[in-house]
Amino acid sequence: MLDILLLRKDLDSAIARLETRKKPQAFLQVEAFQSLESERKTLQTRTEELQSRRNQLSKQVGQLKARGENADAVMAEVGGLKAELENSAARLEQIQAELHTLLVAVPNLPHESVPVGSDESGNVEVRRWSPDGQDPKPLGFPAKDHVDLGEPLGLDFDMGVKLSGSRFTVMKGPIARLHRALAQFMLDVQTREHGYTECYVPYVVNADSLRGTGQLPKFEGDLFAAKKGGQDGEPVPDNAALYLIPTSEVPLTNFVRDQVVPESELPIRLTAHTPCFRSEAGSYGRDTRGMIRQHQFDKVEMVQITHPDRSYEALEEMTGHAEAVLQKLGLPYRVMSLCTGDMGFGAAKTYDLEVWLPAQNTYREISSVSNCEAFQARRLQARFKNAQGKNELVHTLNGSGLAVGRTLVAVLENYQQADGSVAVPEALRPYLGGDSVLR
């Protein structure tokens, strides 16, 4: 959530920055905001006047009583002021709630270094990497896609449809082993080499957790709501609503909700391997073949909670942590700086890592690393105690390290051999019993 003080100080500048984001989108109901702000200022001024008058009269009451004089008239006026103050306080509370409702629908302000653009065509390539130089080396034979390569190895889309519907996949045998090996390898890299603490988290979270990281209320349609037994047809109170996690960013970042962290404990680095559940609303007809876009997929998530002065240094660092996995696996990729029109709701700046897929002859997203600055922390009331002893909002960052399913797709396509078999990347062989070919 944006700092309301920033909007009060320079609304025009904030609106100009917001308008560089994806359109059409109602970022802020400006007229409603200005009307509420005007009423708030008037009420606050009146409230301060009433409080000052009440204090003066209360002093008079004490003086009159000390002299043995009648104070009934003055006390009656104090009583009248009390009622007006209570009414003002109630209306101020209502205004603050209405302002909050407006602000939770507003995305983060793009950082000044973010390229301006209306959609993904405005994204800027930062660098690319390949084991053979910058560009991927041709396979030397016609590339099969991951579906044709994976089905003989245990990738079963028909069973996924039978069990759950479209955009679900079953993995068996060699493919299941490869999937598990990838997740374990990613966790080992992030915990042993990059200092993240491995966490096991619930796959079901409450509405407060999703509000804290920004998925609610704006993106409820992208979530899977969970119902307890016997809840069918019964209204569920907001504070009892439960959802399947769309990413472990949600539980990990919420570790610091309503907390004041000692500055000496920053940065906090957390990682978790979890399934992620997304309805993929608005993605109908896109990536219908294979594993690229699923309702359920696994991801190793990285989260950092940092000092505000060091969050952009942490963004570069985390991007490198995701790149390290791709480099160890020998997978060609490029790093893209997302433009203002392609960034996520809570991000101030985002890098996407895109892996090379030979069968598609293109790069596809495999990781997204974002600095949310204080946007989530303000919702979460996640703070640290600074050197002066004052509480200050932390900055939060999150990123994939990596999406396991898409990494599996990339391994199948980049390590395919002319006979249709798939070689095992050297880094994964210890996790697969030393096998050099997936079998």
From Swiss-Prot:
One Pfam family cited in the UniProt record for this chain: tRNA-synt_2b
UniProt pathway annotation: Aminoacyl-tRNA biosynthesis; selenocysteinyl-tRNA(Sec) biosynthesis; L-seryl-tRNA(Sec) from L-serine and tRNA(Sec): step 1/1
GO MF terms held by the record: ATP binding; serine-tRNA ligase activity
Biological process terms in GO annotation: selenocysteine biosynthetic process; seryl-tRNA aminoacylation
Cited Gene3D superfamilies: Bira Bifunctional Protein, Domain 2, Serine-tRNA synthetase, tRNA binding domain
Binding residue positions for L-serine: T247, S248, E249, E301, S400
EC number: 6.1.1.11
UniProt remark on domains: Consists of two distinct domains, a catalytic core and a N-terminal extension that is involved in tRNA binding.
Protein name per Swiss-Prot or TrEMBL: Serine--tRNA ligase
Species for this entry: Paracidovorax citrulli (strain AAC00-1) (Acidovorax citrulli)
Organism ancestry: Bacteria, Pseudomonadati, Pseudomonadota, Betaproteobacteria, Burkholderiales
